């Protein structure tokens, strides 16, 4: 028995998150025959609902917003703090479907994987690493959509977001190379929509500044742009 939805929604959201994860895993994917031959799952699902962890995500996002002078990160940071939970769905240890479709610009999957091997390794410090197989990115979108549909069947409000997923990846909460966060709430109004952009004065110094996020593009001596967590961008 419960006397208020507040008493029940923690367990409710966790249960629905499990069902959403199942929907993401069982969603259609390219190269289904490869699974029948023993290939492993490449969809990662991680659920987070702890208030301290959600606050960590929000702090990272606020610092990211200050670094880039982008208020939208501050808006989504406030949203992260208000969530009942977030289900992260991403591509981890993916492999191509061996369709040789050419959508990546290469004639074969093998050629694409070999030609981009070094770039994928070097981009691991980026907010998301890449490049990816286009079909696998489509698979990720289908998985996220399937999860959102499952949540809607049980009247849990969601919104698909990438900024919270970036924070989770950079904080080591998920291992995916690219991911989407399915924010989950049980409230009178879905807080993921219609939130106003906060007023922000980026010229005011914070009294207690967090460490740099390491996501500011910095031009290296060889003329390339990199995300260097060991360097702080010039003012």
Model-identified regions with their sequence ranges:
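Acidic, surface-exposed loops and disordered segments
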Residues: 1-235
């Amino acid at each position: 028995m419960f006397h208020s939805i507040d008493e029940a929604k923690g367990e409710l959201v966790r249960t629905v998150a499990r069902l959403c994860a199942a929907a993401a895993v069982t969603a259609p994917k390219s190269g289904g025959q490869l699974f029948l031959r023993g290939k492993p799952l490449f969809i990662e699902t991680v659920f987070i609902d702890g208030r301290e962890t959600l606050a960590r995500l929000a702090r990272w996002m606020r610092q990211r917003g200050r670094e880039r002078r982008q208020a939208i990160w501050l808006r989504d940071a406030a949203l992260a703090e208000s969530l009942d939970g977030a289900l992260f769905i991403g591509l981890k240890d993916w492999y191509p479907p061996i369709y040789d479709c050419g959508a990546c610009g290469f004639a074969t999957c093998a050629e694409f994987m070999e030609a981009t091997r070094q770039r994928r390794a070097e981009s691991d410090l980026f907010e998301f690493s890449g490049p990816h197989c286009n079909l696998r990115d489509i698979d990720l979108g289908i998985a996220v959509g399937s999860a959102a549909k499952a949540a809607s069947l049980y009247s849990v409000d969601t919104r698909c977001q990438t900024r919270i997923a970036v924070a989770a990846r950079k904080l080591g909460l998920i291992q995916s190379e690219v991911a989407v966060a399915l924010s989950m709430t049980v409230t009178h109004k879905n807080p993921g929509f219609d939130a106003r952009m906060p007023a922000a004065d980026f010229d005011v110094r914070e009294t207690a500044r967090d460490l740099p996020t390491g996501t500011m593009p910095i031009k290296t001596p060889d003329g390339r742009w990199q995300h260097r967590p060991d360097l702080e961008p010039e003012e």
